[in-house]
Amino acid sequence: MSDRVYLTRDGYNRLKDELHELLHVTRAEVLEKIAEARSHGDLSENAEYDAAREQQSQTEARIADLESKLSSATILDPKHIKTDKVYILTSVELLNLDDKKETLEYTLVSSEESDSDLGKISVRSPVGRALIGKAVGDKVTIIVPKGELHYEVKKIFVK
């Protein structure tokens, strides 16, 4: 059995919608491409057929992945998230201890919902792992390819 997946209601619904699209639209389109490529004759040197079969393989793998994640999902309600420490679905404001000016804000989410452009980082990322369990006032050292970054947890909240 796979690991438990923690999702927001929106994240769960997005994955469910993607699964529905794959099952009811993409799968049929791929089967049409395979049938079309087969109609061109010799399959041994048919790049179109090979590409369609590869797309089918990727589609079926994604379907299996989504079904697994959705079946092991726990939907988290932000209203029930504690803010005494950094947990999944909490947002955290960090002060850069090296320059005392820069502040960063991240929201910790599951890998399935991470989006760095929106400040949503995975609890499994190096930054997420460093922050989990920290409380306001705690110092955090985050190891990145360029070296170490030093922050202090200034605020923990739920959006």
From Swiss-Prot:
Pfam families: GreA_GreB (PF01272), GreA_GreB_N (PF03449). SUPFAM superfamilies: FKBP-like, GreA transcript cleavage protein, N-terminal domain. Keywords: Coiled coil, DNA-binding, Transcription, Transcription regulation. The keyword Transcription regulation applies. One of its GO terms (molecular function) is DNA binding. Transmembrane segments: none annotated. The keyword Iron does not apply. Disulfide bonds: none annotated. One of its GO terms (biological process) is regulation of DNA-templated transcription elongation. Residues 44-75 form a coiled coil. InterPro entries: GreA/GreB_C_sf (IPR036953), TF_GreA/GreB_CS (IPR018151), Tscrpt_elong_fac_GreA (IPR006359), Tscrpt_elong_fac_GreA/B (IPR028624), Tscrpt_elong_fac_GreA/B_C (IPR001437), Tscrpt_elong_fac_GreA/B_fam (IPR023459), Tscrpt_elong_fac_GreA/B_N (IPR022691), Tscrpt_elong_fac_GreA/B_N_sf (IPR036805). This is Transcription elongation factor GreA. It comes from Chlorobium phaeovibrioides (strain DSM 265 / 1930) (Prosthecochloris vibrioformis (strain DSM 265)).
